[in-house]
């Protein structure tokens, strides 16, 4: 049974800054079993591991709350920070803050998770759906194409810049720079002061999935095209084509890239030469993120099947079938939490 606390503001959690630093989880080798399943009252847009035994849930109606993995009674505090839906959020594990955006309310909130209080709230006309945290600067896109650089401590405006073209992606890239993707295939690198560093034009569909590490930006689109970009110089290193749409966010692990296609295939690729190391063929669409856990990859098939693969050779370690299609998934220290199409949230525990 879920118990909803009477307090209407803030999150029900007790964490320190050290708790928010996620170390590498144990390898999920063992026998998977369901520890518990509960029915959520609203459909979640976000399910994310937060710290200790807490997971963060943000629903489409605009509720924000946490759940405790270890408790048989799921004690929850419902919090409605806005009158309307939440469009985007950022968890800053370096400061213990949660940033929430409502484009329908045109508002942005900074919440201190350590002291359980609101730091500041700012009204931003025409606020869009893209945000990024670059060092201590919060980047916010307006629907007008203007990017605002805000001081993350107080919400004050530091810089602003008008971007030509429709922005379809925005993210922090190492080291403390901003990546901007536009619908015309433009890829841009900016400093946290919104000064341009480099610009690259590539042939890629709008709204690609992308990821980055200290050296590279990897982008993939709905035609199966993959672009590997040097994130310091903004140069295209090489490109690949897997001839099937890619909707699932990519996984980088050292010099290896792991990706999944809409046809249910998972590939391991060597980024030194672009060669395919292995292929695993499953059944059905993959549109959830590939999750890395030391030497393994967790793959969620939309129809309800989870598969754990070895990163070195793609061999299957175990699989688990749920009764309904999977909508959300997040790794936790001893397993995985999933939400299905019936709004059922389940903790699949994997112990040696």
Which residues fall in each region the model found?
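C-terminal motif of bacterial Sec signal peptides marking the signal peptidase cleavage site
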Residues: 4-6
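Repeat-blade elements of multi-bladed beta-propeller folds
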Residues: 9-18, 41-63, 84-109, 122-148, ...
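A short helix->beta-strand "capping" segment at the edge of beta-propeller domains
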Residues: 19-43
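A short beta-strand motif characteristic of beta-propeller blades
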Residues: 34-38, 73-80, 117-122, 156-161, ...
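Well-ordered, non-transmembrane segments within structured domains
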Residues: 62-65, 71-86
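Short loop/turn segments that connect beta-strands within beta-propeller blades
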Residues: 68-72, 112-116, 151-154, 191-195, ...
């Amino acid at each position: 049974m879920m118990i909803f606390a009477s307090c209407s503001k803030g999150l029900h959690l007790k964490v320190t800054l050290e708790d928010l630093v996620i170390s590498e989880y144990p390898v999920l080798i063992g026998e998977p079993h369901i520890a518990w399943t509960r029915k959520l009252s609203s459909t979640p847009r976000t399910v994310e591991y937060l710290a200790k035994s807490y997971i963060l849930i943000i629903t489409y109606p605009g509720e924000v709350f946490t759940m405790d993995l270890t408790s048989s009674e799921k004690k929850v505090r419902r919090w409605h920070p806005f009158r309307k839906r939440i469009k985007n959020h950022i968890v800053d594990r370096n400061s213990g803050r949660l940033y929430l955006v409502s484009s329908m309310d045109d508002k942005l909130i900074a919440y201190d998770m350590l002291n359980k209080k609101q730091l500041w709230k700012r009204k931003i006309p025409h606020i869009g759906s893209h945000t990024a945290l670059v060092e201590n600067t919060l980047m916010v896109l307006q629907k007008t194409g203007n990017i605002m650089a805000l001081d993350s401590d107080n919400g004050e405006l530091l810089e602003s810049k008008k971007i030509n073209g429709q922005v379809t992606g925005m993210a922090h890239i190492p080291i403390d720079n901003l990546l901007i993707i536009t619908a015309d295939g433009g890829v841009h690198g900016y400093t946290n002061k919104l000064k341009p560093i480099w610009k690259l034009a590539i042939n890629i569909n709008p709204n690609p999935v992308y990821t980055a590490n200290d050296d590279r930006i990897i982008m993939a689109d709905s035609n199966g095209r993959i672009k590997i970009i040097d994130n310091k110089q903004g140069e295209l290193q090489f490109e690949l084509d897997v001839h099937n749409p890619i909707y699932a966010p990519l996984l980088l692990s050292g010099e290896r890239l792991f990706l999944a296609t809409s046809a249910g295939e998972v590939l391991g690729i060597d980024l030194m030469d672009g060669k395919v190391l292995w292929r695993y063929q499953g059944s059905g669409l993959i549109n959830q993120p590939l999750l890395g856990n030391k030497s393994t990859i967790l793959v969620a098939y939309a129809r309800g099947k989870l598969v754990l693969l070895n990163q070195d050779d793609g061999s299957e370690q175990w699989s688990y079938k749920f009764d309904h299609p999977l909508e959300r998934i997040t790794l936790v220290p001893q397993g995985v939490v999933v939400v299905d199409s019936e709004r059922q949230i389940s903790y699949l525990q994997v112990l040696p």
